[in-house]
A protein has these predicted regions:
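Feature marking long nucleic-acid-engaging regions of large polymerase/nuclease enzymes
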Residues: 1-176, 226-236
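Gly/Pro-rich turn-and-neighbor structural signature
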Residues: 177-231
Length: 237
């Protein structure tokens, strides 16, 4: 073992499904509703009175000073559903589940309830993760790759800088090595600016529910560099 952290951590579709169900969408149907308990919130969702991602207030069992107590929390219906699987001994988990947070959550469960119940918990989140990824219908769509409107300006500015560097070299103001380094610097700067623009647009698209962005942000698959190559520019070769 490298650091003692659990290695039985869900991946890919499972992570994506759990991330999706715990994400909050501002203005979703049923936002602001108050429920007496978890069961009430789940019934309201099943009866289509509120959305899976709506922010609601629910009275839940949570750890307060090491003791389980009932208290009202601002959460989402999706998080209530996830907490049906999480052992009550670790309290109410009120956050977005990503691959990173899952590792800590699993470690807490193992510490609190032991291996046997932790295995049941892992089976439960595995099944829920797969089911929610299926229900969400998340896939890689061409329309999910958002090309930033600033792309033409950013690339154009970079090309102008490179042209100036080449002109300086041809006039003998800089050496060949300096020319090479300055061209690399110019395109690296363009690439970084484009990546920032791509991620800004992806984060804001569909209130953060862009399928490709969710795959990236959850840790299920992909990286910012890969998305930037698809929506921005291929980059330096």
């Amino acid at each position: 073992p490298a650091n003692g952290a659990p290695i039985t951590v869900p991946s890919q579709d499972m992570v994506l499904g759990l991330y999706y169900i715990t994400k909050i969408r501002p203005g979703a149907k049923g936002e602001g509703l108050t429920f007496y308990g978890s069961e009430e919130a789940i019934i309201a969702y099943n009866e289509k009175k509120c959305d899976l991602h709506s922010q609601v207030k629910v009275i839940v069992d949570d750890l307060v000073d090491g003791k389980l107590q009932k208290r009202m929390v601002e959460t989402s219906v999706g998080r209530v559903i996830v907490n049906q699987i999480i052992p009550t001994e670790i309290g109410y988990f009120n956050g977005i589940i990503s691959k990173k947070s899952l590792r800590g959550l699993i470690a807490d469960v193992i510490k609190a309830v032991g291996m046997a119940r932790a295995c049941e918990f892992l089976d439960g989140i595995k099944n829920l993760g797969y089911r929610m990824a299926y229900v969400a219908g998340l896939s890689f769509n061409l329309d999910d790759i958002i090309v930033p409107v600033e792309k033409t300006d950013i690339v154009g500015k970079g090309q102008s800088e490179v042209d100036q560097v080449k002109a300086n070299y041809e006039m003998g103001f800089i050496t060949d090595k300096e020319r090479y380094n300055q061209v690399i610097d110019a395109w690296t700067h363009v690439n970084n600016n484009l990546k920032q623009a791509v991620m800004k647009h992806m984060t804001e698209a569909d209130q953060g529910f862009n399928a490709v962005y969710m795959m990236l942000d959850s840790g299920a698959r992909g990286s910012a560099d890969q998305i930037a190559q698809l929506a921005g520019m291929r980059g330096l070769m």
